[in-house]
């Protein structure tokens, strides 16, 4: 299963407007400058470092190696200056003002905490990154992860943003231990596939939420986060190198505003025993976090440190159309691979009565508001069991590590085996054709149908 990250970009700005590049160009970058580029969906560029040193979100680029980037917004930074060869069409410009000094200082501060943790036999820093949408949270998470790996560390990286996938399809929450370099061409890299990979693959633990925003169903989001935290914390305790390195936790921008969002941040802080909070691009959020956590301590008695970091000027707004195209590209690559690896999904036809499909409920917290006297449901459920219908065409189902006989709570807490795509629904014959990464039975597993990612285009066309 090839599951690239979404490759979104961060990093600082300059007032100059981007210029279109259509052919081979040579760029001479001065020390402490950044080359920012945007590649349209369906297009690609090739970049080669001819001399000097350069990196993408902390991962160093090899000299004279050609890197290919498809449909992304990204940046290349150089500490000492470099010479780049760029081949292909993109929007690009060079910025000299960047927040990299503050970011690298943050990395060194975390390294000191990791060294202290190793000496004391304690847990390393559990870092939570918060901030509004499009402030570079994921890019900072990549950068801190890459720098930690370059120091010989093995951070556990956690994604709690269901709108974008980390080593998985959007709609899921994941955690993975990073022991090797991040694949700069694929964002976070890829998980294990049936084909070869030039960069060591990652092995994520995946849980399915299935909605775009935590606020769409808080009563489902919170227990899924709790289960993810339990799994990540257990891994931390079982691996000495991971334990001293700690965690890096990415969050959705939507929870960085309003009381409901702040309560979700508090839940994440509590479940992951967070002791470092990095606030990106919002003084108001930083003030609120100080009010909530300046006197707060973890269960181990550790104080919570808050650090406000500037948003990079290179952060750009990614409109809904761009993000939808990215999700569709991610799903297509999951089943069919990319330009480097061609994958062949297995096709199987299953009868309607063989499937156990559960639909994720939305806005469940609102339903009890209409009960008399403010009463709540005795046993609220997060899923609704549904029969196959034509509306499932082109949708994605999560195949759970559970039995069809299990309770809904057990199914919710189970990890994801993989995903299947509904290629055809035949109501007359009561059959459904699905695509799966591997030739495996899905009829003995519960399938979860969420509204996120939304139904993509016809992958078979």
From Swiss-Prot:
Q: Name one Pfam family in it.
A: Clp1
Source domain of life: Eukaryota
Task: List the record's Gene Ontology CC terms alphabetically.
Answer: mRNA cleavage factor complex
Annotated membrane-spanning segments are none
**SUPFAM superfamilies cross-referenced by the UniProt entry:** P-loop containing nucleoside triphosphate hydrolases
Q: Which GO terms describe its molecular function?
A: ATP binding; polynucleotide 5'-hydroxyl-kinase activity
Name the GO terms of the biological process aspect.
mRNA 3'-end processing; tRNA splicing, via endonucleolytic cleavage and ligation
> What is the protein's major site of localization?
nucleus
Where it sits in the cell: the answer is:
Nucleus
Q: Which residues bind ATP?
A: 34, 73, 134-139
Q: Sorted alphabetically, which keywords does the UniProt record give?
A: ATP-binding, mRNA processing, Nucleotide-binding, Nucleus
The cross-references to Gene3D superfamilies, in alphabetical order and at most eight, read: Clp1, DNA binding domain (2.60.120.1030), P-loop containing nucleotide triphosphate hydrolases (3.40.50.300), Pre-mRNA cleavage complex subunit Clp1, C-terminal domain (2.40.30.330)
Function in brief:
Required for endonucleolytic cleavage during polyadenylation-dependent pre-mRNA 3'-end formation.
Q: What does the similarity note say?
A: Belongs to the Clp1 family. Clp1 subfamily.
Q: Which PANTHER family match?
A: CLEAVAGE/POLYADENYLATION FACTOR IA SUBUNIT CLP1P, POLYRIBONUCLEOTIDE 5'-HYDROXYL-KINASE CLP1
Q: How does it assemble?
A: Component of a pre-mRNA cleavage factor complex. Interacts directly with PCF11.
**What is the protein named?**
mRNA cleavage and polyadenylation factor clp1
Q: Which organism is it from?
A: Botryotinia fuckeliana (strain B05.10) (Noble rot fungus)
**Which lineage is the organism of this entry classified under, starting from the top rank?**
Eukaryota, Fungi, Dikarya, Ascomycota, Pezizomycotina
Which gene produces this protein?
clp1
């Amino acid at each position: 299963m090839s599951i690239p990250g979404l490759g979104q970009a961060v990093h600082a700005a300059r007032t100059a407007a981007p210029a279109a590049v259509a052919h081979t160009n040579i760029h001479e970058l001065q020390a402490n400058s950044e080359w920012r580029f945007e590649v349209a969906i369906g297009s690609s560029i090739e970049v080669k470092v001819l001399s000097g040193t350069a990196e993408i979100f902390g991962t160093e680029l090899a000299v004279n190696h050609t890197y290919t980037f498809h449909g992304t917004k990204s940046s290349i930074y150089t500490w000492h200056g470099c010479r780049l060869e760029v081949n292909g069409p993109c929007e690009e410009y060079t910025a000299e003002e960047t927040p990299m000094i503050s970011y690298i200082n943050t990395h060194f501060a975390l390294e000191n905490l990791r060294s202290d943790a190793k000496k004391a036999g304690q847990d390393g820093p559990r870092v939570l990154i918060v901030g509004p949408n499009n402030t570079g949270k994921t890019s900072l998470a990549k950068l801190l992860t890459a720098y930690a790996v370059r120091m010989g560390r093995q951070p556990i990286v956690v994604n709690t943003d269901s709108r974008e996938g980390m080593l998985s399809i959007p709609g899921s929450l994941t955690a993975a231990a990073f022991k090797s370099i991040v694949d700069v061409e694929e964002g976070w890299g890829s998980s294990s596939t049936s084909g070869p990979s030039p960069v060591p693959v990652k092995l994520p633990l995946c849980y399915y939420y299935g909605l775009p925003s935590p606020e769409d169903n808080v009563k489902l989001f919170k227990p899924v986060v709790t289960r993810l935290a339990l799994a990540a914390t257990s891994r931390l305790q079982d691996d000495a190198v991971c334990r001293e390195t700690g965690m890096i936790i990415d969050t959705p921008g939507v929870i960085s505003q309003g009381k409901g969002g702040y309560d979700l941040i508090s839940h994440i802080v509590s479940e992951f025993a967070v002791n470092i909070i990095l606030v990106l691009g919002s003084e108001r959020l930083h003030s609120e976090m100080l009010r909530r956590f300046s006197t707060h301590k973890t269960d181990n008695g550790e104080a919570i440190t808050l650090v406000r970091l500037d948003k990079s000027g290179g952060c750009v707004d990614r409109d809904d159309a761009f993000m939808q195209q990215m999700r569709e590209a991610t799903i297509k690559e999951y089943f069919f691979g990319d330009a480097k690896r061609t994958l062949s999904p297995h096709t199987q036809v299953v009868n309607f009565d063989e499937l156990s499909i559960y639909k994720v409920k939305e806005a469940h917290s609102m339903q009890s508001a209409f009960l008399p006297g403010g009463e709540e449901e005795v046993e609220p459920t997060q899923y609704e069991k549904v029969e196959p219908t034509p509306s499932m065409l082109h949708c994605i189902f999560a195949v759970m590590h559970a039995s069809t006989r299990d309770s809904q709570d057990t199914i919710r807490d189970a990890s994801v085996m993989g995903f299947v795509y509904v290629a055809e629904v035949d109501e007359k014959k009561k059959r459904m054709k699905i695509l799966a990464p591997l030739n495996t039975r899905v009829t003995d597993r519960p399938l979860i149908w969420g509204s996120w990612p939304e139904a993509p285009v016809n992958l078979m066309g």
